[in-house]
């Protein structure tokens, strides 16, 4: 493991982000400073891996479910790109269809 990768791991080990596991990211204003710092640290680590042609696919298979209220192409493309980066297939849900089954 190279020095820079170890720095990311060391930085994450100093942060408390344990409450994020199996949670959502809807209410970002409720996240702690440590949780936000952990998100940015992981993003930096993923960027470094990608820049060095190291696979960032942490999933062999799986779905990234999207349920967006707006029709923003930029938002949908960003989500699809992130899912692809991690090895997930995107499944778009229509909000109107989702309500019919609730």
Predicted segments with their positions:
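Anionic-ligand anchoring segments at beta-strand to alpha-helix junctions in alpha/beta enzyme folds, i.e.
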Residues: 75, 80, 85-98
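Conserved small/polar residues in nucleotide/adenosyl-binding loops
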Residues: 100-102
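Positively charged, low-complexity intrinsically disordered leader regions
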Residues: 2-77, 81
């Amino acid at each position: 493991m190279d020095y820079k990768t170890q720095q990311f791991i060391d930085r994450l080990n100093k942060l408390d982000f344990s409450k994020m596991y199996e949670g959502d990211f809807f209410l970002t204003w409720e996240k702690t400073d440590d949780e936000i710092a952990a998100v940015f640290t992981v993003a930096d680590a993923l960027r470094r891996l990608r820049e060095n042609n190291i696979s960032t696919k942490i999933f062999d298979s799986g779905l990234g479910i999207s349920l967006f209220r707006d029709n923003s192409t930029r938002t949908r493309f960003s989500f699809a790109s992130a899912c692809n980066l991690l090895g997930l297939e995107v499944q778009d849900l229509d909000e109107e269809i989702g309500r019919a089954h609730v």
